[in-house]
Amino acid sequence: MTTKEKLSLLRNEMKANGLDAFVVFNADPHMSEYFTPYWEERKWITSFDSSAGYVFITQDKAVLWTDGRYLVQAKNQLTGTGVDFYIEGTKDAPESDQWLLDELHQGAKVGCNALCTPHNTWVLLSQTLKRKDITIVDAPLIEKIWKKRPKDERQTIYVRPEKYTGESATNKIAALREIMQKKGVTHFLVTALDDVAWVTNLRGNDIVFNPVFLAYLSITPEKATLFAELKQCDDSVKAYLKQHHIELKDYHDFFKEISHINGEKILLSPDANQSIFNTVQPKNTVYTEVSPIQLLKAVKNETELEGFRKAMIKDGVALTNFFCWLDKNIGKVELTEYSLGKILDKFRAEQEGFLGNSFAMIVGYLG
């Protein structure tokens, strides 16, 4: 299916739902920097596969905003697709929210998948659109037309031993409860995957280059509940959670569970997805501020610092081995940036404790 055909299907859905415009952000429900192919809605609808960019679609226009790193890529991938683009921050690029406001009539309606939209972005867009009484509504339309969507694959969750973390999950949860008490909140809903992994000392491989797993975490003064795919948790993980007094519930039960919260004071990051706010805001008082987990994990304990030191030494050994190999082989075999990157990966993988790279190698044009 071509991009133009996909846009035509989407516009039919927009018309059927009374929408004058539709916004697709590059995000998953946890606002992860990297995410699984299942959530690549912007990539699917536009055929633009960079890591940055979002698209605004009306009945007669589709415009994508991205940054200067992807100028050449945008030209190559979007030309002739029916999707125009702007490079943010350049003199010819309008502010995206203002562009949408100018394109729409008084009282128009804009659709967006709230599950993949951070709350702060939703609020800012709503404030701009309010100038013309334009409303933004939750409308997950992509799922209606993306028929061959990839499966949302999950991998086994595992425990990160305390000899690496330097602090137990029990102590971390206790510290968060102290913060909650000082702030006067009764519930803390943790939505960022790295935050969930840090608090629980659990890791996974659901997202390439990121040792995390898809999950939410709810903390109250009496209870901590991890919402994760049950089949990802073997008996050892279940026993570990029980040891640290963390209840395990299915990932897909999260919204049903939080819909029962009533009359409470809830702490949420402004980066949490708008669907969570839509669920809890009507019946509770919601406080939005930077997750206290971000602040806690920014201060490394001595065990973590020692881990950094050891990692740097191991990486230094890998680099030394790589340079020795290069010195012996340069001029004897054909070498490209890509092939050198694979060789460097091999030397790093030889080091004890290697789990994988933190991002894909960045290779120059034509490798």
Model-predicted regions and their roles:
Residues 3-7, 90, 114-122, 166-170, ...:
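Generic detection of long, well-ordered alpha-helical segments
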Residues 72-73, 144-154, 281-285, 313-321:
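Short, compositionally biased low-complexity segments
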